[in-house]
């Protein structure tokens, strides 16, 4: 995308004056507010009538009487005058646009007519004149009352210019008309021909036809009226045309914009183009947001989103609309993002998708693959010709080389003027643009074959500003530069590149597809036709080859009736249409600051943070964020932190290990000297003595600071220096208080960490569950129960590991990133590796890799590790959790049952010293449950039958199972087989209501794709599930080792996955190939470690995790 250097001046600057009226305000009286529109409508209808009877003799005949009445008493209504029809029409449009000069003209005109009617009514006793005078008094009164509603300005000096245009135009028209009358006089006498031409062209047909003794040919009257209409049209347009913004950026304006971009520009790919210096700018009153714009054809055209703080966008938009309303400009926006378009839409603008911006994500960009074949071939072809790419920041390019780059960019431009407005900077080589990137294609002989210049897009992106290639350079130079930029972008910290904006991208893409409708094809054909001049399709084709991400961009405008004018104004601004300019030069300089009136709020200028040369504000002087708003207690602690620093006290010192833990200190004999460290939980100051409570992970101890031991100054310093929550080190001797409480009698202390936030209520702690999860560190610091749960978890995990190790199992680690998700029926998380441009899954189970190790000969192997399943979150589910999987050769699922029970019982001993678990009792308090000995074992179908009170077995027909489901309101899908329906019944009737740990065995084969069929019972698999208190704790199989059967089952699973079942497994060819090398008969065990901890401790899954997943902050 190239930048536009050609813009246009206006005669006068559009400089707002305070106070500015807001759109739609004025008197704020609803009826008076509509006066401009009503006046415009009435005069508009009248102008149409004048036009119609001027060209139609029949209509003129029928309206002769009312026309003469209106013409005599109310408003000039000549019988034939196209020029008058045009004048009234322009006056109507100006009134509807609230132009103040139109109000003056209409009011003065009515006043003059009123004076005439008053004189006639007095001298001639004319009742009609008197009635008309009364009506005109009322109309004039309404106009005077509604004067504040006519606030739109026209250009300064427009009246004198319009008068000059009118005089010259009428003189030329009269002379041409006189010549025509002389050529075609008709019955008009010689002495009346000049007057006839003068009357018809300049006198607005004030003299009626009856005052002349003859007539010229009919077509002459039409031409004479046309001459007058042209002159009046030019004059009235000169008079009524809207003020055109002549102002542009000043140095302070650009400096403020750069400050806003530094703070808020990371998400706006077009933001840097706001510094284009031939644009004007309007700021929010706070200076925290701004809109850059240009005025073309009476349209105030903003470019892209507002710059700055999104919270201040509405205020900037309001100021922009007020400015446009003041000068009668229609408002429109080119290239707004979805966020920006939403803000403009809330301000009353209509939004229309204009096209899409092409975004390259450089970490995902790769030349491999079928879709990139065209780019890859072009790059290879150019590289073979010895072309290389050089990429530098503008600030690193020597001045003479930059001058040559500018010369080449001008020489290789294929149009007279540079195109671009919303996505073009309009300058090269400016010292303030040092962060811009220059990409050059360099031929073997050192000549430059192509140039790209890209502007910053936040700290990690760039946006294409200028693209040039040497006419004789080989095809593919641009592809080489873009691909090299994308593949080497990490050297410049670039992760995203914004390429050209493709107008109507979806039309080109969808209109060329098979099956596109006729309307879409016609629309595409029209765009292709205009692409001969405006390169619409070429921009799309040049971008789509890179497989970019398409981000929609929008056109915003006030009124559908203005859409054509807005579109034409946009074409003018972007350089697609060049209009002739008269008077002053039509160009505005995009290289220098030509603005004469700074738009930046005076408060920002007064802060002396802005630079008149346009550079970004200095550090600390720009309107930068001050961080989060701090509560008062935090501010007090921050002040105390600063005070400590001023006193030379380091609130975060280097380590000095304590001599004892708190528990060790408490157990030490009286008089023992100790040094402990922990968090200060309580302070009680009694003047001469201060009591405090310090806690480390092992326990709490009371600290006693006695004035008699340390002195008055030091005891005061202790009370003043520390706050609750601070980390402290205290040294002293173990002793007792006067009331006999064991205490550490402090001699020395120091702060090891200043806590900047107050602790929660010392009795209630963190009562909100979400806060407890989000601030887990606080909960653990003050909540002993939470600490005991984590201790129990650690004991359980260590016990599981030690128990398996003691049985001869080897612990291994298998990949977490996997190319195929398998080993369980669950929805996976998807991620992407940039190095190989490959989609990967976070594992849902380690099973298939552990079985590969079984094939390799590891007879006893286990893993304890994290797995990830994209499922719901509740008291027993977390998206990531810890699993234990163990495999033993020459074993089966029955031996795994014994192993599982013993592992859990041993873990309970590690946590509590006995084979007990904790469960909530009726009152919510935890009670002990003995889990020693054997646990119940039932088949799945037997458990379902007991709940239903009817016989259910693996042979029960599907229709009977469906009938039972309907009877007990158990949902199922019509496509499920009998095994799936039976398992659904088990989950609803059995699993949810099981309490004491129970093994359920022999599940349907169709629901166990990795399990060996039961050796004696057809239709079921050698599998069990362990359930306790409604939670599935683990499962075990006699593993399926037949590779042919396993391939068939996984193929069925992959077909389900292809059909949309996201929980079905994919076909893992590598695993099947390993299985084909033979795996011994194996028993496999899988157990949820988090759920085992839940079972033993009686907590929820969130309580047993150090950091469970928390909801996003609102």
Swiss-Prot record:
- Which reaction(s) does the protein catalyse, per the Swiss-Prot or TrEMBL entry? tRNA(Lys) + L-lysine + ATP = L-lysyl-tRNA(Lys) + AMP + diphosphate; L-lysyl-tRNA(Lys) + a 1,2-diacyl-sn-glycero-3-phospho-(1'-sn-glycerol) = a 1,2-diacyl-sn-glycero-3-phospho-1'-(3'-O-L-lysyl)-sn-glycerol + tRNA(Lys)
**Alphabetic keyword roster:** Aminoacyl-tRNA synthetase, Antibiotic resistance, ATP-binding, Cell membrane, DNA-binding, Ligase, Lipid metabolism, Magnesium, Membrane, Metal-binding, Multifunctional enzyme, Nucleotide-binding, Transferase, Transmembrane, Transmembrane helix
Record flagged with keyword Amino-acid biosynthesis: no
Q: Which CDD domains match?
A: LysRS_N (cd04322)
Stretches the record annotates as Phosphatidylglycerol lysyltransferase: 1-618
Predominant cellular place of this UniProt entry's protein: membrane
Ranges for region Disordered: 1-26
**Residues holding Mg(2+) 1:** 1025, 1032
Q: Which residues cross the membrane?
A: 38-58, 77-97, 101-121, 126-146, 164-184, 219-239
Record keyword Cell inner membrane present = no
Membrane topology is:
Multi-pass membrane protein
* DNA-binding region per UniProt: 674-751
Q: What is the superkingdom listed in this entry's lineage? A: Bacteria
Its BP terms in the Gene Ontology are: lipid metabolic process; lysyl-tRNA aminoacylation; response to antibiotic
Stretches the record annotates as Lysine--tRNA ligase: 619-1114
Q: What is this protein called?
A: Lysylphosphatidylglycerol biosynthesis bifunctional protein LysX
Kindly list the GO molecular function terms attached to this UniProt entry. Answer: ATP binding; DNA binding; lysine-tRNA ligase activity; magnesium ion binding; phosphatidylglycerol lysyltransferase activity; tRNA binding
The residues that the entry says bind Mg(2+) 2 are 1032
- The signal peptide, as residue positions, is none
Family statement drawn from the similarity comment of this UniProt entry: In the N-terminal section; belongs to the LPG synthetase family. In the C-terminal section; belongs to the class-II aminoacyl-tRNA synthetase family.
UniProt-listed Enzyme Commission number(s): 6.1.1.6, 2.3.2.3
